[in-house]
């Protein structure tokens, strides 16, 4: 029984340094011989995998700055000054408590690689990087220059030469020698006036804009005056004249109906002399009509007799 117990001793499971391969030893020697090649690998899932990748990226992006501790510095003040956490400073400097900070002469501060602090702050004792920096790309460019840069520089040089040639031709064509200052001023003003139409044409308003039908403000004011003031005045005057003409026409027509044989001037003259109109009455009766107008009572007495 003792030998059997010795053969079937319990061995604890062993884990390799990598943390992924597990070997289970709770079995006999025969089982170990049969299953010595079988190993099991545990894959990381979910948050653990994300945490490992995040920690790896975080270590790649961290730069260690060294700062001498001065009088009045505290752990919280340094953390606020360099925008990092107190826990990160403790982890980098292997500090157990906050009081261990005062036993140090210099402190290491973890800062992100691409930040404003790494560009503006210059540490006193240099800068330490956790991982070696990659080979810069500009060195390869210096070793093997590109053809595109050469062609661009050549084209730029040729363009500048052409510009210089044009300037020389312009200087030769124009007479820059002036006898007095007035000629210089007149020449400069002429050039300014010559270039003014180009600038004005750029800011010129489109005549076919559409919102105002291409008319100016003064045209709109004239149209409003015509529509709002002049047209109503003419309308009122026209209707007043028509009313007066209608009244005079009706008066003349009424008088002509009462005395159809008289013309208006004769009728008016007879009415002023208090003589009744005689036109249209027979000639033999005109005298009787006049006498009747003069003495109607005598005429009535004659008829009674």
Curated annotation (Swiss-Prot):
Domain LysM, by residue range, is: 65-109
- Return the Basic and acidic residues bias intervals: 286-305
Looking up InterPro entries in the UniProt record yields: LYSM1-4, LysM_dom, LysM_dom_sf
Q: Segment Disordered: which positions?
A: 253-305
Where is the signal peptide, in residue numbers?
none
Tell me which residues are glycosylated.
7, 26, 199
Q: Which GO terms describe its cellular component?
A: Golgi apparatus; Golgi membrane; plasma membrane
Q: What is its main location?
A: membrane
Modified-residue entries (Phosphoserine), positions: 55
Q: Which PROSITE patterns match?
A: LYSM
User: Per UniProt, what is one GO molecular function of this protein?
Assistant: peptidoglycan binding
UniProt keyword annotations, A-Z: Cell membrane, Glycoprotein, Golgi apparatus, Membrane, Phosphoprotein, Transmembrane, Transmembrane helix
* Residue ranges crossing the lipid bilayer per the database entry: 217-237
Topology in the lipid bilayer is annotated as: Single-pass membrane protein
The record describes the protein's role as: Essential for Golgi structural integrity.
The protein's name is LysM and putative peptidoglycan-binding domain-containing protein 3
